[in-house]
Design a protein with these regions (language model features):
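N-terminal alpha-helical modules
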Residues: 19-129
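Sec-dependent N-terminal signal peptides
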Residues: 4-15
Length: 129
């Protein structure tokens, strides 16, 4: 029984990561060129967030289409609730607003959006390019 569980766990880990697109190559290159300058890091993250946001919209469509017709309303509702939760978590008002808190906000939005898009891709078996 333990061996079956271990096998399923390993298969689950690899199957999820097999489809995960993660950050774009442009983002990785951009971040390497920032020289740890906060304004440049912010610019890279903002661009990547826009890319991941579009990607999320793109991969949600086949994910929704794959759901049974009677469950599509719930899938849409769940997606909208997730968007609201992401925005609430990432856009909380800091006591002091500065470059670092803005970086935290955009990093949160970017990473949560990328992770959700990765999940939709893994569940549909499609990889967006």
């Amino acid at each position: 029984m333990k061996q079956i569980f271990s096998t399923l766990l390993v298969v689950g880990l690899f199957s999820g990561s097999a489809y995960a697109m993660g950050p774009t190559k442009k983002y990785e290159a951009c971040m390497k060129q920032t020289g740890n300058v906060l304004s440049e890091i912010d610019a890279c993250m903002s661009k990547e967030y826009k890319v991941q946001k579009k990607r999320l919209e793109k991969v949600f469509k086949p994910y929704l289409a794959k759901a049974p017709a009677e469950e599509q309303g719930l899938v849409k509702q769940s997606h909208q609730q997730w968007l609201a939760q992401r925005d609430q978590i990432c856009n909380n008002k800091p006591i002091v607003k500065n470059e670092k808190t803005e970086l935290q906000r955009i990093s949160c939005l970017m990473q949560m959006t990328q992770t959700r898009a990765d999940m939709y891709e893994a569940r549909t078996g499609r990889i967006s390019k």
